[in-house]
Amino acid sequence: MFNRRAVIKTAALGAVSIFALMSANASQAADKELKIGFVGVTSGPAASWGTSNVRSMQVRADWLNEFGGVKIGDDTYKIKIVTFDDQKDPKRAIAGMEKMAQEGVHYVVGPNVDDGAAAVRPVAESKGIIYFPYSFPKELYTPPASNAVLGMIANYQSGPAIYKYLKENKGVKRVAFVAANESDPLSQRDSGIEAAKALGLEVISTSDAYQNDTRDFTPVLTPIVMQKPDLLVLSGVAPGNAPLLIRAARELGYEGFISTETAQDAKVLEEGAGELANGFISVGGASTPEIASDTMKEFVDRYTKAYGEYNDESNTKVYALDYIIETMKVNPAAIDNVEEFKKTMDTFSAPNPFVKGDDAKLTYVGTTSFGQKRQIGIPMVVTEYKDGKFETLFVAQVD
């Protein structure tokens, strides 16, 4: 006998099953996860370099996830940031990169210093990882190397621009260099000396160095200050040491210019040197009020609300995650295949969300410096510290 009630019940159960299946599939699609790693320094005197990276990545990831994630190919992904503090130790950097490989991470931001960036290269190349160091040795970015992408402006790009500006606009003629006795700052010192000499400047100090844990810089700076340079370059100086060096130089009576090619933290300068830091020149974040888009302004606002403060360096550090994601959007096969990512870099172009204007683009650069495109394209913003904040000195570009 035809049982209408049974048919209705069966149909209802079928509908529920189909709905459950659709919900499960939708949930599965929504739950796709794209892990992006960070291996760098978030403790010690250089902590602000890596902390700026992590905070920038997390704020941007949370923002993208808030709007449903990112669509790459046919799938939508939520971004998960996986972090590792290498404590500025190359051995720990290697361990961090190995951890990323174990977790299936193919794209890593960092490390922040030369030793770490060089140390992780074999792991990155053997495990199929593209990494974005904030360190300057050219051998990381020139052929046959191909897995590292410079995430900022290099000292050998910004240094000559700073020295030329000071020579032409401030009458600087004599330059002295001082650096921590570590490979990263020493390398930057050597590049700076070469650039200064190429500009016809007189270099009066080329070998002065200090241990990175030094806290009294008076003995180090006394013989330099006595030579009365027009410009004192703090090569590769860590943010925690910069105010100590500045304070010591000023208290010794030095009245000339002080600069560095590394990014700094305005709050650290204010707390450690106060008004004595006024006039200190450094490479700022890749934004100024004049060029910042509404997206950049909102990023700063979200960052400040999340952490109670903002680091100007994050104007640069915000870029890495977008470069990774936007390159994958152009070639979805790059999600788990870094060779596909590399193929896309030469012709890659996408709107730059952080700079005003329709003609602002994200593109890879570095051909002049490295013979291949292994650097993210960002504005070169040189800043001058004044009364607790950085003010723009000039803006330039690299190719």
For each feature predicted by the language model, list its residue ranges:
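Extracytosolic ligand-binding ectodomains
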Residues: 2-10, 14, 29-399
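Bacterial N-terminal signal peptides
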Residues: 12-22
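Sec/Tat signal peptide C-region and signal peptidase I cleavage site
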Residues: 22-29
